[in-house]
Amino acid sequence: MSGALLVAGTSSDAGKSVVVAGLCRLLARRGVRVAPFKAQNMSNNSAVTVEGGEIGRAQAIQARAAGLEPSVRFNPILLKPGSDRTSQLVIKGQVAESVTATSYVQHRDRLAALVLNELTCLRDEFDAVICEGAGSPAEINLRATDLANMGLARAADLAVILVGDIDRGGLLAHLFGTVAVLDPQDQALIAGFVVNKFRGDPALLQPGLRRLHDITGRPTYGVLPYADRLWLDAEDSLSVLAHRVVGAPDPPLGDDWLRVAAVRLPRISNSTDVEALACEPGVLVRWVSEPSDVADADLVVIPGSKATVADLSWLRERGLAAAITAHAAAGRPVLGICGGFQMLCRRIDDRVESGAGEVAGLGLLDADIAFHPAKTLRRWQRPLAGYEIHHGRVSRCAEHSWFDSDAEPQGLVRGAVFGTHWHGLLDNDDFRRAWLVRVADAAGRRFVPGDTDVAARRDAQLDLAADLLAAHLDVDAVLGLLDGPPPRPRLATRLCR
């Protein structure tokens, strides 16, 4: 077995990342040397690699599915939106510059050569490379500069599987329409379809799939059921916006639920940090955006942000800053992670990310933050595992450290207010359980932690994704596409008959 294929989608959050992760785990279990690849990702959920670079978190979890350490090779271009018009451009793990949609186009030829070279090297090294597209190939206004969808498929002669989310409605039109708007050369690369998140009896869908085959000349390789217990790290903000409650919480082992309000910031980054909390029995994590949502919370979490100063201003405008301050004044726990930690401090000097200069923070921690042009990218392994991705650094501090790692003080704490630049800290099981007991005591809750192993649960979820594909996908037909796109008719020809 050798080759590569591309998993594209009818939209963002259609299920591309899950299908790629499932295929990587399925192949790895068969002893196939497989690697994930996403030429260009736009996401503020990122991870630090073995090289000390930064990639999309989805590619990090896909690497785990394949039994590999995350590497910048798996996601050579990462765009991190900082506003509606600008993004931070990360090339092979390192920050290059801030770009607009217009200025980014100027880099297209150089970046296209880079991603094609990376994919070629991976194909030489691995038996199979499972590529993931970005957004939807139906965005034909972007086709001339596309690096991740049909642009990559055409350059590398990849067969393309098109995944659609039927839970949103209108899927058959989405699948047909996506193929229909492509030019004939791109149409020829679309090998077939995968239906994702189907509820009910698949037999009811068959007449529609037969009609889809008749008008496109393309098969549907599988119908994946809606799996509400499937828990994989979310890639983009659509996943956060779609679910008010994180995960499917198990009932408490003690007398009380522990209620967590995670603030849904406009430029949220690494929203996955709160998912470890949602793994614990008796912990209910909700995404919130109104002051009233904070009132009954035992713990408030301000997650990371790609635009710390702008999101801090948003907190104030919505009245959330006052609600969080009142929550802390009552002695109830607050946690800030990365950008959220910076917001908790007394003063922020940002002449890098926003150019706002000196800005007052919430003042819940007696410390100052200064932004630096050089981004801190660091992985920690022992005794606690975590990673850092930030421009802001503590420039003055009058608080106690929260915890130590490698004999270095990390994070800050004042009473029941906690802050850290670390992502992934709550994935440490013993640390998380002990801290939740401390949080529950401060909140007056009778909470008993469970024995959840987050790493084992994450691997079990990857196995579940692979099992779903094995049971509901024509895996042999899909793997046959690794050799290249099979002949498929032009849609216009089919429709004129």
From Swiss-Prot:
It comes from the Bacteria. Coiled coil: none annotated. The keyword Iron does not apply. GO terms for molecular function: ABC-type vitamin B12 transporter activity; catalytic activity. InterPro entries: Class_I_gatase-like (IPR029062), CobQ/CobB/MinD/ParA_Nub-bd_dom (IPR002586), CobQ_GATase1 (IPR033949), CobQ_synth (IPR004459), GATase_3 (IPR011698), P-loop_NTPase (IPR027417). The keyword Cytoplasm does not apply. Pathway: Cofactor biosynthesis; adenosylcobalamin biosynthesis. Keywords: Cobalamin biosynthesis, Glutamine amidotransferase. The active site is at 338 (nucleophile), 423. One of its GO terms (biological process) is cobalamin biosynthetic process. PANTHER family: COBYRIC ACID SYNTHASE (PTHR21343:SF1), DETHIOBIOTIN SYNTHETASE (PTHR21343). Belongs to the CobB/CobQ family. CobQ subfamily. This is Cobyric acid synthase. It comes from Mycolicibacterium paratuberculosis (strain ATCC BAA-968 / K-10) (Mycobacterium paratuberculosis). The gene is cobQ.
